[in-house]
Amino acid sequence: MLQINSRLAVIDGWLVDTVKRKPINFRSPEVRLLLPNDDDYKKLSQQNLVDWTRLKKDSNSVLVGVKSMELFKHIKLVLREFFLLEDGRIILKRIRSKLRYKVVKKLTCKCCRLYLPKWGTVYIHPMLKDKEKPLAGVCEFSLDVNPDREYPLIEINVSHQYIIIEGFLLYLNERRLYRWNDNNLRGQVGLTKWAHLRKTYNPVNLDILYSLNSNFYFVKDDLLFQLLGKRVFVKFCKVMENGKCGKAPLWYRVKRTTTAKATHIAYAISNSTAPDSFKSKNNDYRFIVREKPIVENTISNLDYSDIKKQQFTEAEVVKRKISADISQIENVHTQFNSQKEKNNIRVNKVSSEVLDQISKFPVSRVTLLLMSAGQDKNYIELVEELARRLEKICIEKTTQSLEEIRDTFQANPEMQARFDKEYYQSIEEYKITLELIKEDLLITLIKQMENMWAAEKKFSTEEEYVSPRFLVADGFLIDLAEEKPINPKDPRLLTLLKDHQRAMIDQMNLVKWNDFKKYQDPIPLKAKTLFKFCKQIKKKFLRGADFKLHTLPTEANLKYEPERMTVLCSCVPILLDDQTVQYLYDDSIIPEFEATSSYATKQSKCGRKMSLQMEPDLLFQEAIRRMRHLTAYDVLRRNYIAAFEELYMGNCND
């Protein structure tokens, strides 16, 4: 270290303000103010100082390692969190939202911030040499999350999501831990499923932590700390607890501390959130401690095996007591619980790699599936926007229909109050049903839409007039006079065409009509010219969940298939040589959806007029029946598909 004056010194090529404990850029104007003496300034200019601009030019990352242990003894270090991206760069955590690269690893280290006016900000940290002892107070660690590990994701009525990590129940919507033995949670989940989940996963570790005399609980899985986000730095302390016969046994407790003295990271839980029976304890906080230390501290006089033994011994006793208490609650409630549980509870497996990509919960199963499949972020955002628009259309349509039923009781406030209980419950239920329909249909609808843009079968796209009457287009020979396709092998062509014209047709790659005999269902085509010049008829078909059209079933093969629905489609009939008829339809046009017939509409209107003349109780029952019908899965499913078609046709017309 070369002392320039009482304040400035040069340490391994770095100019350091030893009073403010920070590096100073030699090119900064403040250097001249700190060195009014010309001799001192000349002395400084003769030193081989580090060029700060090279730090940014030579590195794609904002975190730069410096091999100077002496330098970091004389400057202040602060703890910062960084992301290691898949392209190899290291960036500051808070600017992740601006980037499109996947985060490979999260790391935290003590560093010093340097600001370069033209180049931005970099952070320097000590880069240790081989066989060199770690610098006291400089800690570096990263959260080590296994991307392939899977966790149970519990969904309650679609909109509430929980995850279980090492026996801790985390409410993802608020990123908050929950006690398992909680009356509100038990009521939300339902007693039967609450008991089943407890036996399967036993997520009672927060209950155990609140019951311990110790104020800490070790956790190995770093995903818990990653999802909770807010972390504190702690260390273990020895305390003397009053025991029997005046003895004072040794006891370990966790205490918050500075980053320089910290041995572990932890998540702090205030005792104010604990049950009333635990609030009398003297401790303000309890800590979920990451089992792996920040840095291996060889100087520490603490025996971590004793600390872990303390937790294990105490936790086993508490766990048995809590399990017995919960079992007793289950038995008592089971005897007196006769209510049917209506909540929709689902448990799925989700990997930590997928969880790391989610910024906000709850997240739909559709999004989870797309993330698991490795879909592009922009594609997922488009699908989510489409889902929101479809949901909005369906909710507006269904709510309008329900409001019409509700208006029936405007003249009878007592009956309306009675109906409103069912009304608001139906609104909640059909919104959940819509979410389930989205999971069942949305990806399928999108795939079918994409398939519509691709030809089902590739035909020749040549367009050529063989004669003023006959045109070859889209792989077909079209009779413009009769406005229909004609078989190239039709014997009538012998009289209608000349030899050279027939020879021209033979050289073209046209559709072989015998191939149509292989198809039992209508054939989708992308043939704009064919459908432009040929007469089309309207015909009813069945449309399956795969969006393909099928012929209507006959009495011989009639069977109930709820996933199919009747549609009216424009098509071109062709008569084959065996006198059977095949139908060609444009697969870029979505057929008309027969939601309700005119007769059914009239019947509905008549039924509404008749309902006004019913007795109040009969009117109420009829209104409930109609409301149940409107919010049924099959009806909402048809509305969802109709909304999708509406958006699709709107985009096509644009």
UniProtKB/Swiss-Prot annotation:
Q: Where is this region: Sufficient for interaction with SIR4?
A: 322-654
Entry keywords, A to Z: Centromere, Chromosome, Nucleus, Repressor, Transcription, Transcription regulation
Q: Which SUPFAM superfamilies match?
A: ORC1-binding domain
Q: Which domain of life is it from?
A: Eukaryota
InterPro entries, from UniProt? ORC1-binding_dom, Sir1_ORC-binding
Where is this chain's protein located in or outside the cell? Nucleus; Chromosome, Centromere
Q: Gene Ontology terms, cellular component aspect?
A: chromosome, centromeric region; nucleus
Which parts of the chain are coiled coil?
Answer: none
Annotated segments matching region ORC interacting region (OIR): 449-587
Q: What's the subunit arrangement here? A: Interacts (via OIR domain) with ORC1 (via BAH domain). Interacts with SIR4. Interacts with CAC1.
The record's function comment reads: Involved in the establishment, but not the maintenance, of heterochromatic silencing at the cryptic mating-type loci HMR and HML. Is recruited by interacting with the ORC1 subunit of the origin recognition complex (ORC), which binds to HML-I or HMR-E silencers, DNA elements that direct the formation of silent chromatin at the mating-type loci. Establishes transcriptional silencing by recruiting the three other SIR proteins, SIR2, SIR3, and SIR4, that function directly in silenced chromatin and establish repression. Also found in centromeric chromatin.
The protein's name in its UniProt record: Regulatory protein SIR1
Q: Organism source for this protein? A: Saccharomyces cerevisiae (strain AWRI1631)
UniProt lists the gene as SIR1
